[in-house]
């Protein structure tokens, strides 16, 4: 199986998984599991809030946009070839994740956890936008850096995974999202990153 087909399969699988989970969030089983996680995290929140605020930073627009720009700039400066092969995939990772998670939220208007609602966070919960955005940019950036020969997969893959997991966990720790929102965010980010990686292959 070539790279394009493998990426297409991964992206389609992630997208289908995200939609399936969106439907599943309406079921009693998933809601019960989400409440169980929230019940366990709630008493820990005062102690982990500071670490969670740091962990969530990579999902902020002021972080993932510059991160994508830094990856693109590194590729352009270090390697020959069209700059668009880096600019388009990295820009699409940020913008694509934002557009997709907002589109899904418009369809599945899921309420946030009580903690978030009490703090005025009333926009739909599923999927976690911070998690989706960070995952898309991190995964796309890691893929491009490896394909360009600028970083070994043994280094960038663990770093990207660790940061992506930290962002997702922080959204639950801060009380902004249910655990299934975060899983949906990871799946959304993977789906978007797969499309961006395919675009890179076509532009290279």
What are these model-derived regions, one by one?
Residues 25, 38, 42, 72, ...:
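Membrane-water interface at transmembrane helix exits
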């Amino acid at each position: 199986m070539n790279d394009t087909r493998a990426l297409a399969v991964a992206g389609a699988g992630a997208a289908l998984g995200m939609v399936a989970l969106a439907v599943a969030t309406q079921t009693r089983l998933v809601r019960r599991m989400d409440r169980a996680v929230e019940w366990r995290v709630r008493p820990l929140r005062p102690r982990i809030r500071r670490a969670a605020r740091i962990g969530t930073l990579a999902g902020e627009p002021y972080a993932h946009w510059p991160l994508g720009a830094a990856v693109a700039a590194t590729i352009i400066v270090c390697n020959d070839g069209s700059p668009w092969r880096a600019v388009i995939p990295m820009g699409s990772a940020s913008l694509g994740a934002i557009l997709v998670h907002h589109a899904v939220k418009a369809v599945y208007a899921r309420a946030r956890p009580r903690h978030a609602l009490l703090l005025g966070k009333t926009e739909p919960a599923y999927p976690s936008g911070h998690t989706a955005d960070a995952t898309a940019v991190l995964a796309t950036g890691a893929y491009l850096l490896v394909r360009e020969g600028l970083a070994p997969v043994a280094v960038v893959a663990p770093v990207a995974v660790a940061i992506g997991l930290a962002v997702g966990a922080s959204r639950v720790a801060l009380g902004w999202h249910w655990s299934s929102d975060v899983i949906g965010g990871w799946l959304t980010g993977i789906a978007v990153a797969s499309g961006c990686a395919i675009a890179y292959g076509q532009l290279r």
